[in-house]
A protein has these predicted regions:
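Sterically constrained small-residue positions within well-ordered secondary structures
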Residues: 26, 49-51, 99-103
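A generic structural signal for short, non-catalytic loop/turn and secondary-structure boundary residues
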Residues: 27-28, 53, 84, 105
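Short, positively charged, low-complexity/disordered linker segments
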Residues: 56-81
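Acidic-leaning, charged glycine-interspersed low-complexity segments
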Residues: 79-119
Length: 119
């Protein structure tokens, strides 16, 4: 299973399947989750072989109709990721609160470092 498909399977149930990589659909329904890669750690060894495990810095956004709903989903995301079967997950700080005036929605953003086995 790819990292993207595993994230979709893990995060989707928290918002009725509305978890998307990178961008929202054209006509989004809320609440929803957006996740995107934002770099990560890459390590090489003297023998020139790549490590078996890969690392991805993941930014996870929640958009919802209320602050309470956005915060609750963000908390569930942290629990789902940190209790998942990824080899290691590290939250980089707590969620940041957001508000998007153009769509009148409340949001959060939190970054995680995820070690995973590529498929």
């Amino acid at each position: 299973m790819t990292l993207e498909s595993k994230l979709k399977a893990l995060l989707g149930p928290l918002v009725g399947g509305r978890a998307y990589p990178d961008v929202t659909p054209d006509k989004p329904e809320f609440p929803l989750i957006i996740y995107q890669g934002a770099g990560g750690q890459e390590r090489w060894y003297v023998d020139g072989k790549r490590r078996e495990k890969r690392h991805q810095r993941l930014q996870v956004f929640v958009w919802a109709t209320t602050r309470a709903q956005a915060s609750s989903i963000a908390d569930q995301i942290g629990t789902a990721l940190c209790e998942s079967d990824f080899p290691a997950v590290e939250p980089y700080g707590s969620p940041t609160s957001l508000y998007e005036e153009a769509i009148k929605k409340y949001g959060t953003r939190q970054d995680f470092g995820i070690w995973f086995l590529p498929s």
